[in-house]
Amino acid sequence: MSKAFHSIGLIGKPHHSGTHKTLKRLHHWLTMQSYDVYVEERVAAEIGPQVKSVDLLQIGEYCDLAIVVGGDGNMLGAARVLARFDIGVIGVNRGNLGFLTDLPPDTFEEALGKVLQGEYETEHRFLLESEVHRHGEMKSSNTAVNEAVLHPGKIAHMIEFEVYIDDKFMYSQRADGMIVSTPTGSTAYSLSAGGAILTPNLEALILVPMFPHTLSCRPIVVDACSIIKLVVSPDNGDALEVSCDGHVTLPVLPGDEIIVRRSKERLRLIHPKGYNYFHVLRNKLGWGSKLF
């Protein structure tokens, strides 16, 4: 049987016993099948001195498949880097929910074996690009797979800002913040804040206010081509933040403008054959099964 992939990168959560165990099994299993295996440097030492230790960028350059062992947080961290490369990404779930990690940690061999033989489905997920502008100059930027969140930082309190869609004024807002989410992120922070679930194939963004001081403000879904602009009131007394996937923080000052748009980068997710998004939702969210 011909191989669908040849060079494979292993990524995982450092200093986590469950992840360490699965990574060692994966490395041995893949090496015995003559795959060229690279291991992210943060976890390479835990597997042994004989492994090929590389960073995430090198995995993107050298490999045609990356296997992420951990939870969705680990997948998000890897995805923000790997999305710029032509590499497939699949996850082994060692976290809690695992919306993005399909393979079971203790019995991954059968499903992964079929994937490596070419029995898989490919799904492309777009990312967000967030920029902070100050006095007409971009001060910082980063990407997000799930969401970009404008918020006050460590202490929750109400902030004031204006929201523009494609330079058209939508409304002013007094709230604890604003979540701008992709369909991928619609089952994460956005869902907890009352946002709708968007199926991954939708080219759309959802804006979810956080605890707005009004009874009429609701989440709104806009086209993914839209450019979202959040203008922070100069009267806000404290420095704010834009959080990308909860991992990367961009500092924001009163009067700054935050631009959020769809990134040109797309994550190429690999799923086992027969993957069903609604089956994942039922399992993870406790929905009822079929009645007949």
UniProtKB/Swiss-Prot annotation:
The organism's place on the tree of life at top rank: Bacteria
TM spans (from-to): none
Cellular component aspect of the GO annotation: cytoplasm
Subcellular localization: Cytoplasm
Active site, per annotation: 72
Family named by the database record: Belongs to the NAD kinase family.
Listed name of the protein: NAD kinase
